[in-house]
């Protein structure tokens, strides 16, 4: 099986180039050399750039969520890299099919590292330093298992490197067993990790990062998708369910543990949309764990570049508009006064007036000023007289911007864009991190878990900290309306960070999993007046099997004990 493969030599097992051709025993002789081996496994964390998952790194799972659709080659709408329109099969989930191999590759690398380091000369001579490095690797392995859980449900639990004498016919562990493993690992290693890091070590594991992983894991486990009485599966329920009486209180306690370490403070203040947008462009105290960027990180080259500007800028800026936000999604953003777009304060004829701050920070809409000019998605009624908009997907504008990548929804992602780069969107943005865990998520985790545990006062307090930072009113709702307010805050605050794909699933919200994908079509008349109409771009199907990805059929065929996810 692909995820059990190992090799006979030390160098092959670690699958890296050992500097200066050191023999394995020399590599394992000092903490400094072992640290170099550890650091390559940080390539397991998410990124904006190119690597073995080219498409799945230039865009996140937002293109298969309520947030966005894929927009590559928009003139023909030929690309559906995650296969969300045709529907998933056991042999085709698009680029998501790479997840299984990529996630297991780093689990194996972690297991090999931990086995080789155990009893090494470096560990004998420097036990405390080596235990700290092992704790980092165990954190990275636990993070991989958390992703395997989200995509597949219960998976085989492998904690040592396999040898040729081992039994490869290993069944999947239950969902609850994998959750318990992650939590146990975090409880063991958190005291061994530093609380925070100096700026030169930004991006390495900390106690806060480990506890944030525990918080997310327990929140997901407690959710409706994994409740035995609500799970959509009809067989092998142990692969998908979590059945602990105090699960919501456990999730609340895990989030509170992070908050207590941070100091139970307000989030970084953002007086306007520009300040909010800049939260995502550099390291700051609200970030608990992120992947840093640069030509080299910690002295070794990485397999990524930092490309959100190129991938997500509108076409007229030579961008790809790769993940175009859905009109359905943009309507979730409130008005400036805190009312919804269903309220009288929303002007349907001027949908972008008086919206909440995060709308302007996250979304590139028609008429928004971006990199020095207004965005224009409009298509002329006669482009021989009045030209099409620079950012449209008109096939007649081949000389303007990036011809193939005009937005088909009438939107593009503004979040993560560094406008200080000017018009050269292909250059790297120095210091911009890919954020994996941050404090606002923990506050929302705490609010949701507290509500479900029966503590509405705490839920209101912490969801309001997030909404008020965005200049929205404090949340005063109670009961089901409070839970919906918490969910809305997650959809908006955590936009395009890889959460919504999983959130809607764990909430069993199928209305936001299968639906008509809406956009706004902008038209320019001969007097250059612009108008719009809402239209349906496509219908996105959803089948209950799509709560999880299929395990690659090749793995199922090889291994009798490995059970396929239901429906595939």
Q: Could you describe each region identified by the protein language model?
A:
Residues 11-81, 155, 187, 207-211, ...:
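An aromatic- and glycine-enriched ligand-binding surface/loop that stacks and positions planar moieties
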Residues 377, 381, 421, 440-446, ...:
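Active/binding-pocket-proximal capping segment
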Residues 10, 103-106, 181, 272-334, ...:
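Long, intrinsically disordered, low-complexity segments
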Residues 1-6:
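Bacterial N-terminal signal peptides
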Residues 14-17, 149-160, 226, 453-465:
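Short, well-structured active-site flanking segments
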Residues 23, 31, 35-51, 73-152, ...:
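Conserved, well-structured interaction surfaces
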């Amino acid at each position: 099986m692909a995820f059990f493969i190992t090799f006979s030599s030390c160098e092959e097992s670690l699958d890296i180039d050992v500097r200066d051709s050191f023999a394995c025993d020399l590599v394992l002789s000092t903490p400094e050399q072992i640290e170099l081996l550890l650091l390559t496994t940080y390539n397991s964390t998410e990124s904006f750039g190119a690597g073995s998952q080219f498409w799945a790194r230039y865009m996140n799972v937002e293109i298969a969520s309520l947030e966005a659709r894929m927009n590559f080659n928009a003139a023909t709408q030929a690309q559906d890299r995650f296969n969300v329109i045709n529907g998933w099969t056991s042999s085709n989930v698009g680029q998501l099919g790479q997840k299984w191999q990529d996630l297991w590759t780093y689990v194996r690398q972690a297991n090999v590292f931990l086995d080789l380091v155990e009893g090494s000369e470096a560990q004998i001579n420097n036990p405390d330093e080596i235990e700290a490095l092992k704790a980092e690797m165990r954190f990275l392995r636990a993070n991989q298992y958390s992703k395997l859980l989200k995509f597949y449900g219960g998976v085989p639990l492998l904690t040592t490197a396999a040898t040729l004498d081992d039994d490869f016919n290993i069944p999947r562990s239950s969902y609850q067993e994998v959750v318990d493993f992650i939590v146990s690992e975090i409880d063991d290693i958190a005291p061994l990790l530093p609380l925070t890091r100096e700026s030169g070590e930004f991006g390495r594991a900390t106690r806060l990062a480990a506890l944030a992983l525990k918080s997310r894991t327990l929140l997901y486990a407690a959710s409706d998708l994994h409740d035995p009485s609500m799970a959509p599966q009809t067989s092998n329920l142990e692969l998908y369910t979590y059945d602990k009486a105090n699960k919501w209180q456990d999730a609340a306690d895990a989030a509170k543990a992070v908050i207590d370490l941070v100091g139970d403070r307000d989030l970084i203040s953002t007086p306007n949309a520009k300040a909010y947008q800049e939260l995502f462009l550099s390291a700051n105290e609200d970030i608990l764990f992120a992947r840093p960027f640069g030509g080299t990180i910690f002295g070794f080259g990485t397999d990524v570049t930092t490309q959100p500007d190129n991938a997500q800028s509108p076409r007229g800026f030579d961008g790809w508009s790769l993940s175009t936000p859905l009109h359905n999604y943009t309507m979730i953003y409130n008005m400036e006064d805190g009312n919804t777009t269903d309220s009288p304060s929303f002007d349907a004829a001027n949908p972008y007036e008086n919206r909440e701050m995060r709308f302007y920070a996250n979304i590139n809409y028609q008429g928004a000023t971006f990199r020095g000019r207004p965005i224009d998605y409009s298509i002329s009624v006669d482009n021989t007289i009045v030209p099409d908009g620079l950012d449209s997907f008109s096939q007649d504008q081949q000389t303007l911007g990036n011809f193939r990548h005009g937005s088909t929804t009438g939107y593009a992602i503004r979040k993560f864009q560094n406008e200080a780069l000017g018009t050269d969107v292909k250059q790297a943005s120095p210091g911009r991190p890919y954020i994996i865990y941050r404090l606002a998520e923990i506050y929302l985790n705490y609010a949701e878990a507290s509500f479900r545990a029966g503590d509405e006062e705490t839920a209101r307090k912490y969801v309001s900290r997030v909404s008020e930072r965005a200049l929205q009113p404090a949340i005063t709702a109670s009961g089901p309306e409070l839970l919906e307010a918490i969910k809305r805050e997650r959809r908006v605050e955590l936009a395009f960070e890889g959460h919504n794909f999983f959130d809607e699933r764990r909430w069993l919200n199928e209305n936001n999993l299968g639906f008509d994908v809406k956009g706004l079509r902008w038209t320019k008349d001969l007097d250059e007046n612009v108008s719009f109409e809402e239209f349906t771009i496509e219908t996105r199907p959803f089948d209950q099997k799509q709560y999880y990805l299929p395990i690659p059929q090749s793995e199922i065929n090889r291994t009798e004990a490995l059970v396929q996810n239901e429906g595939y």
